[in-house]
């Protein structure tokens, strides 16, 4: 009689035993309490400010506990992939000095002992764990076509019941091993589904590091774990990767909160210890009185490239994001104006449960303070750097370094340094009266009106005396 093992061998004849990977990726040798975090974006476009926020928090927690922060690329959905997106992610993190200890360091290469760090290069690893689940009777081949699945959904909608592939609707769950083997040998195409042991009428209690106690119904969906192309789905890949890379804390946006029951179930059925989860509230925008998530489509400031274009220093953006992360940071910064942000202790359980509003005025205010602490030389280097990319005219006049340093040196480096620059794109406007070539150009644009009729002069003098003149 054919059994699960025969089925597993037919589907994945070349897959290794999972013990091979368990030995290849041993526990990390880290001090007690060390936190291992990751930033795991998909290479589908630019880095969103929310992604930067998550990485900043993940990097900080790893640093302050002598742990590890790594960059993993989740590229199993190859239809959505954008060319050179990985190097874009790597350089965005570099620009903000949020550098991973291991993981991807360019478009195709990674560093560290727990790689590959690109999911598309880990296909054989996922297949080994999928094979293991099939051997245990915890996963099965599903022969339903996309049309079959659509038909199931239509029936569920008509009957007004919960959509999905579960319970009586999971048609292939009950296909016998013999039948499955025959159908595969006949060349029928299939995917691999997880056989969920869950029941929707049972509750699970989960402790989220940020949100506290959360109750969910158990997962009962038989989700796809390996697609027709042999690559895993996000859910399955993340469970295998976070286990083998020994992630201790998964820090991610709270749009993933509803996946927790499924993820915990996958960890449990695979025999893994689950990581802790910390679900971060999104950064919101006030859109005419309505709070909504910052959106890649509608908001320029959602893309991290926006800050470089505007000339807002990376340091200022990080200070501002740390303010959003922990409200205690503001007082800490006031008490320690000259300390590095690295000395601040971030606490996950002090993070806000609801989304913070993105406040550009506040960010520019933080930025003014950051720039006010720079030396004339640093202001000059930064302004020139920015101008050479975004404003040729400014770059041209800054070529006279000696004069520029005098201009930037005015009221700088004393107890109350000037706070007139909030971003490098402000510089030209702030210094134009110090440069003939800029001032002359503006003089044509704003001609000075000469007033010489007696009536107007009397009117102005009278106004001055009433409003401003004080004999004392």
Which functions belong to the PLM regions below?
Residues 39-43, 73-75, 240, 244, ...:
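Short, histidine-centered active-site or binding-site loop motifs used for metal coordination
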Residues 139-279, 284-293, 303, 455-471:
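Active-site cores that bind ATP or allylic diphosphates and position pyrophosphate for catalysis
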Residues 76-78, 117, 250-252, 304-307:
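Second-shell loop/turn segments in exported
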Residues 40, 143, 195-197, 228, ...:
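Structured loops at beta-to-helix junctions and adjacent beta-edge loops in soluble globular domains
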Residues 73-79, 254-256, 281-284, 363:
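Acidic, glycine-rich active-site loops and adjacent beta-strand->loop/helix elements
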Residues 2-158, 258-272, 316:
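N-terminal Rossmann-like or analogous alpha/beta NTP/dinucleotide-binding catalytic cores
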Residues 270-455:
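Catalytic adenosine-cofactor/nucleotide-binding cores of aminoacyl-tRNA synthetases and other
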Residues 27-35, 64-66, 235-239, 288-295:
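Active-site-adjacent bridging/hinge elements
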């Amino acid at each position: 009689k054919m059994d699960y093992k025969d089925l597993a061998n037919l589907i994945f004849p070349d897959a290794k035993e999972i013990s091979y990977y368990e030995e290849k990726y041993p526990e990390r040798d880290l001090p007690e309490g060390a936190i291992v975090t990751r930033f795991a974006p998909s290479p589908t476009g630019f880095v969103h400010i929310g992604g930067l926020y998550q990485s900043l928090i993940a990097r900080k927690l790893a640093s302050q506990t002598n742990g590890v922060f790594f960059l993993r690329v989740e590229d199993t959905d190859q239809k959505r992939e954008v060319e050179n997106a990985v190097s874009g992610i790597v350089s965005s993190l570099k620009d903000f000095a949020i550098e991973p200890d291991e993981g991807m360091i360019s478009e195709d290469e990674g560093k560290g002992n727990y790689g590959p760090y690109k999911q598309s290069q880990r296909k054989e690893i996922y297949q080994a764990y999928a094979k293991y689940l099939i051997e245990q009777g915890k996963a099965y081949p599903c022969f339903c076509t996309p049309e079959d699945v659509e038909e199931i959904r239509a029936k569920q909608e008509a009957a007004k019941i919960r959509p999905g592939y579960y319970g009586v609707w999971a048609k292939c769950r009950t296909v016998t091993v013999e039948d499955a083997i025959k159908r595969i040998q006949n060349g029928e195409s299939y995917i691999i589904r997880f056989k969920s042991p869950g029941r929707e009428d049972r509750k699970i209690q989960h402790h989220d590091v940020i949100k506290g106690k959360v109750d969910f119904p158990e997962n009962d969906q038989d989700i796809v774990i390996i697609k027709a192309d042999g690559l895993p789905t996000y859910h399955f890949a993340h469970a295998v990767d976070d286990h083998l890379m020994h992630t201790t804390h998964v820090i991610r946006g709270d749009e993933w909160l509803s996946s927790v029951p499924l993820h915990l179930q996958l960890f449990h059925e695979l025999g893994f210890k689950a990581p802790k989860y910390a679900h971060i509230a999104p950064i919101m925008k006030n859109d005419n009185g309505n709070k909504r998530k910052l959106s890649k489509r509608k908001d320029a400031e959602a893309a991290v490239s926006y800050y470089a274009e505007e000339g807002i220093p990376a340091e200022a953006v990080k200070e501002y994001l740390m303010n959003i992360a922990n409200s205690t940071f503001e007082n800490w910064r006031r008490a320690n104006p000259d300390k590095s942000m690295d000395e601040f202790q971030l606490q996950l359980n002090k993070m806000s449960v609801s989304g913070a509003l993105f406040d550009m005025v506040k960010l520019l205010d933080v930025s003014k303070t950051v720039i006010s602490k720079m030396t004339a030389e640093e202001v000059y280097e930064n302004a020139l750097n920015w101008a050479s990319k975004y404003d040729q005219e400014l770059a041209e006049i800054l070529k006279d370094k000696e004069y520029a340093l005098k201009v930037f040196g005015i009221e700088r480096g004393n107890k109350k340094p000037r706070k007139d620059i909030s971003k490098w794109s402000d510089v030209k406007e702030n210094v134009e009266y110090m440069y003939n070539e800029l001032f002359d150009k503006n003089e044509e644009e704003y001609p000075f009106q000469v007033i010489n009729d007696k009536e107007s002069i009397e009117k102005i003098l009278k106004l001055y005396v009433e409003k401003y003149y004080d004999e004392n």
